[in-house]
């Protein structure tokens, strides 16, 4: 471990800079600022912030700066003035890129929020004094870090996935700590993925690493099929000639009888050179060409569905005018990143893979290629499950098709399509999401957008209903707000009904107690007939009723109304005194005795004083009508009286029914007495008018 202080300036320290303007002086002053780093093997950690006063005396070194210090000084030159290099970590070499660093760069944005970027830097060789930017990866709130094992980890930022592998455990631990701190800061500040960092565009526009290094930064550890690194110009030319001749030979030969050695001999005759060193290359190319003979399937005029072999066939891609390639694999590399626009969906062909979360981006990617007038190739390993599911989802959304229609359309053009069970469930869910999205403007959710119903003219007067069954009227859709209100009312009604049930139970308990008291007291009561209540005999009442009906001038309903009131009076006068007849025959005998007594009493003339002193009714038309109706009423309701009379004796009647009958009678006592007094006064007035 060592402490290193570096001057953030150009390497031309010995050149004389003449300040001409004030801004030039300030710029030179800024460039003379220094930064201190803690240097360990393969890593450099910032020790103090720039702008902090430090000792300007540099330590003397007879050997000069080492390789790591030279690399650090070169990397500082790539940064903007407002950016700070927080950590620099050396990574393991990949392919021909031997010297690679990952830089953690931070700065303060316009909103005073700390912005963090990851820069991948390439050096042509160890002693090089210059470096280039190979990749740029921003740290957002949705950025995640996953450990891959063997000291490597993967960083996902939006749709970008990058894999890094530091050269030691110590450097890996330092880098993971710094990444965790940056991710937590972005999450707390809610730095969304759509926000643009001030330095993001600047560094992306200055990516200048060789294509081999660019491919190494985008490589995935799970890649099984990768593109070959370019070789020497002479070997590249020979391989290009082999590809062209090999395709022609395989197209013209009988593939069932020709061998690999015969193919190589035919190539040597065409190239006029020995191809002993190219045997492995020739075998690989033969397999690729045989696989590429299965052309990609044209699902739509602008969309092809194929396999990894179709994605590696440059001639076929250019012939089909493909400009965009959608790679829905984790194990297949991008073969021509410098020629085509790529979108990588790094997923595996497993049932638990969440592929639906990427369908919004894939739809936008395919739509962009279509609007540009070009074509897009969607591929996975074999063009059967992952890429096919993505194309089916695109067709469902773009053309508003059902899942069944989209699958049938794709299978008609590529019969081997077969999404796995997990992707099929996601497609069914996606169909429901699209269906719900279509209804977002429906008046079920927005009542103001409901179409006005046409007014129907009334049917003609002479319209007669047809003999056949009428058409069922169309049910109107219920408004969502009305539906929710009705649900709330139903809940309130349930609460009220529960309260009523509890009240009824309480009332029944109280009535049972009252009934027990009444039952004990009713046994001591003696039934005494009222001597002042008299009625006419049945024969006299019928005769007088006929005469009265002939002489009546008023409406019949008035007379009946009076009769009903008198009937209620008689009933209510008998019940409070518990004058309950034991049977219907006894009740009739008592009525007959009363009629006989009344006939004897009414033979004499009654004066006005006698009328007021006695409540005996006279033979007026109203009273005669009342008496007649009274007899009819007793005959019709005799069954009801019998039930009241035998309340204590009938064993079949339950205790609850007894309580109900007695409670009803008690409630009508007071009301009946008031009505009886009013009716007597009315009868007296009528008698006075007749006299």
Curated annotation (Swiss-Prot):
Compositional bias, Polar residues, is annotated for 597-619
Where would you find this protein in the cell? Cytoplasm, Cytoskeleton; Cleavage furrow; Midbody
Spans of biased composition, class Basic and acidic residues? 587-596
Q: Where is this region: Disordered?
A: 585-620
BP GO terms, sorted? actin cytoskeleton organization; negative regulation of actin filament polymerization
Q: Which Pfam families match?
A: DEK_C, DSPc, PH_SSH1-like_1st
Instruction: Tell me which GO cellular component terms the UniProt record holds.
Output: cleavage furrow; cytoplasm; cytoskeleton; midbody
Active-site residues, Swiss-Prot/TrEMBL: 380 (phosphocysteine intermediate)
Q: What is its EC number?
A: 3.1.3.16, 3.1.3.48
Q: Which PROSITE patterns match?
A: DEK_C (PS51998), TYR_PHOSPHATASE_1 (PS00383), TYR_PHOSPHATASE_2 (PS50056), TYR_PHOSPHATASE_DUAL (PS50054)
Q: What is its main location?
A: cytoplasm
Q: Entry's SUPFAM superfamilies?
A: (Phosphotyrosine protein) phosphatases II, DEK C-terminal domain
The alphabetized UniProt keywords are: Actin-binding, Coiled coil, Cytoplasm, Cytoskeleton, Hydrolase, Protein phosphatase
| Uppermost EC category | hydrolase
The chain positions of domain Tyrosine-protein phosphatase read 295-436
Q: Which residues form a coiled coil?
A: 532-580
Q: What reactions does this protein catalyze?
A: O-phospho-L-tyrosyl-[protein] + H2O = L-tyrosyl-[protein] + phosphate; O-phospho-L-seryl-[protein] + H2O = L-seryl-[protein] + phosphate; O-phospho-L-threonyl-[protein] + H2O = L-threonyl-[protein] + phosphate
Q: Where is the DEK-C domain?
A: 236-291
Q: Which GO terms describe its molecular function?
A: actin binding; phosphoprotein phosphatase activity; protein serine/threonine phosphatase activity; protein tyrosine phosphatase activity
Determine if Cytoplasm is one of this entry's keywords: yes
Q: Which family does this protein fall into? A: Belongs to the protein-tyrosine phosphatase family.
Subunit composition?
Interacts with actin and this stimulates phosphatase activity.
Q: What else is known?
A: Tyrosine phosphatase activity has not been demonstrated for this protein to date.
State what this protein does: Protein phosphatase which regulates actin filament dynamics. Dephosphorylates and activates the actin binding/depolymerizing factor cofilin, which subsequently binds to actin filaments and stimulates their disassembly. Required for completion of the gastrulation movement and for cytokinesis.
Protein name in the entry = Protein phosphatase Slingshot homolog
Organism (species): Xenopus laevis
Lineage from the top down? Eukaryota, Metazoa, Chordata, Craniata, Vertebrata
């Amino acid at each position: 471990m060592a402490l290193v202080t570096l001057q953030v300036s150009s390497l031309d320290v010995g050149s004389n800079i003449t300040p001409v303007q004030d801004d030039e002086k300030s710029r030179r002053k800024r460039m003379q600022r220094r930064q201190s780093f803690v240097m360990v093997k393969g890593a450099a950690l910032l020790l103090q912030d720039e702008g902090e006063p430090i000792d300007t005396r540099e330590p003397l070194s007879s050997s000069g700066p080492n390789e790591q210090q030279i690399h650090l000084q070169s990397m500082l030159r790539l940064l903007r003035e407002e950016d700070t290099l927080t950590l620099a970590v050396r990574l393991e070499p990949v392919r021909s890129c031997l010297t690679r660093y990952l830089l953690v760069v931070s700065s303060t944005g316009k909103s005073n929020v700390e912005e963090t970027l990851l820069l991948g830097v390439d050096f042509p060789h160890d002693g090089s004094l210059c470096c280039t930017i190979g990749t740029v990866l921003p740290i957002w709130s949705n950025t995640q870090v996953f450990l891959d094992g063997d000291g490597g980890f993967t960083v996902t930022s939006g749709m970008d996935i990058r894999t890094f592998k530091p050269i030691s455990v110590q450097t890996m631990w330092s880098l993971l700590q710094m990444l965790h701190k940056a991710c937590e800061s972005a999450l707390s500040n809610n730095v969304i993925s759509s926000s643009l960092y001030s330095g993001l565009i600047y560094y992306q526009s200055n990516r200048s690493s060789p294509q081999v290094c660019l491919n190494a930064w985008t490589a995935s550890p799970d890649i099984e099929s990768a593109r070959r690194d370019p070789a020497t110009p002479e070997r590249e030319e020979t391989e290009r000639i082999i590809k062209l001749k090999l395709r022609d030979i395989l197209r013209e030969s009988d593939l069932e009888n020709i061998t690999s050695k015969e193919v190589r001999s035919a190539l040597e005759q065409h190239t006029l050179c020995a191809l002993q060193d190219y045997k492995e290359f020739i075998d690989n190319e033969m397999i690729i060409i045989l696989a590429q003979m299965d052309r990609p399937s044209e699902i739509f005029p602008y969309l092809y569905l194929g396999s990894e072999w179709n994605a590696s066939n440059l001639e076929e891609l250019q012939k089909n005018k493909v400009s965009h390639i959608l790679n829905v694999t984790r194990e297949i590399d991008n073969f021509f990143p410098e020629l085509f626009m790529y979108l990588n969906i790094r997923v595996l062909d497993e049932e638990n893979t969440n592929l639906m979360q990427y369908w919004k981006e894939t739809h936008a990617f395919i739509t962009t290629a279509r609007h540009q007038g070009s074509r897009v190739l969607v591929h996975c390993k074999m063009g059967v499950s992952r890429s096919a599911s993505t194309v089916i989802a695109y067709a469902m959304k773009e053309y508003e098709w059902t899942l069944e229609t989209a699958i049938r359309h794709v299978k008609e053009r590529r019969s081997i399509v077969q999404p796995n069970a997990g992707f099929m469930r996601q497609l069914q869910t996606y169909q429901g999401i699209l269906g719900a999205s279509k209804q977002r403007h429906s008046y079920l959710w927005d009542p103001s957008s409901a179409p006005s119903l046409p007014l129907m003219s009334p049917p003609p007067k002479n319209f007669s209903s047809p003999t056949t069954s009428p058409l069922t009227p169309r049910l109107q859709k219920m408004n969502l707000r009305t539906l929710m209100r009705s649900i709330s009312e139903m809940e309130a009604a349930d609460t009220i009904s529960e309260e009523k049930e509890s009240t009824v139970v309480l009332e029944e308990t109280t009535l049972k107690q009252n009934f027990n008291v009444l039952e004990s007291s009713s046994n001591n009561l003696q039934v005494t007939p009222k001597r002042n209540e008299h009625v006419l005999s049945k024969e006299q009442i019928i005769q007088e009723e006929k005469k009265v009906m002939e002489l009546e001038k008023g409406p019949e309903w008035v007379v009946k109304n009076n009769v009903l009131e008198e009937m209620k009076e008689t009933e209510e006068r008998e019940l409070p005194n518990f004058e309950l007849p034991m049977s219907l025959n006894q009740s009739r005998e008592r009525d007959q005795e009363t009629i006989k007594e009344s006939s004897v009493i009414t033979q004499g003339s009654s004066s006005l004083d006698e009328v007021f002193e006695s409540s005996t009714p006279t033979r007026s038309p109203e009273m005669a009508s009342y008496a007649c109706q009274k007899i009819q009423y007793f005959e019709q309701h005799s069954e009801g009286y019998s039930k009241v009379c035998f309340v204590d004796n009938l064993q079949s009647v339950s205790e609850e029914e007894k309580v109900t009958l007695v409670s009803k009678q008690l409630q009508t006592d007071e009301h009946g007495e008031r009505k009886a007094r009013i009716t007597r006064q009315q009868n007296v007035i009528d008698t006075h008018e007749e006299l």
